[in-house]
């Protein structure tokens, strides 16, 4: 389940720190969050798709490690990103 080119570009533009920024933790976490949300919809219809579930778990763990890195590096950027994406309650 990959993202469409236009939606991916919109996510990158919305979360980028600079003009050509595609690799900052904020952008990576936002892209992973979008893919995770898409896969959650997939699992509502295909609950026994365990092969894709493994990919989902790997994405969640990757996002978790990126968020941990960002929290240790710059706590204000971390809090802003969490609020923007609505990840924590």
Swiss-Prot record:
Annotated SMART domains: Ribosomal_S15
- List the source organism: Herminiimonas arsenicoxydans
Q: Fetch the InterPro entries from UniProt.
A: Ribosomal_uS15, Ribosomal_uS15_bac-type, uS15_NS1_RNA-bd_sf
Any one GO MF annotation of this record: structural constituent of ribosome
Mind listing the UniProt keywords for this protein, alphabetically? Ribonucleoprotein, Ribosomal protein, RNA-binding, rRNA-binding
Q: Name one GO cellular component term.
A: cytosolic small ribosomal subunit
Query: What family is it from?
Result: Belongs to the universal ribosomal protein uS15 family.
Q: PANTHER family from the entry?
A: RIBOSOMAL PROTEIN S15, BACTERIAL AND ORGANELLAR (PTHR23321), SMALL RIBOSOMAL SUBUNIT PROTEIN US15M (PTHR23321:SF26)
- What do we know about how this protein assembles, alone or with others? Part of the 30S ribosomal subunit. Forms a bridge to the 50S subunit in the 70S ribosome, contacting the 23S rRNA.
Q: Report any Pfam family annotated for this entry.
A: Ribosomal_S15
Q: Name one GO biological process term.
A: translation
- Cited Gene3D superfamilies: 6.10.250.3130, S15/NS1, RNA-binding
What name has this protein been given in UniProt?
A: Small ribosomal subunit protein uS15
What's this chain's function?
A: One of the primary rRNA binding proteins, it binds directly to 16S rRNA where it helps nucleate assembly of the platform of the 30S subunit by binding and bridging several RNA helices of the 16S rRNA.
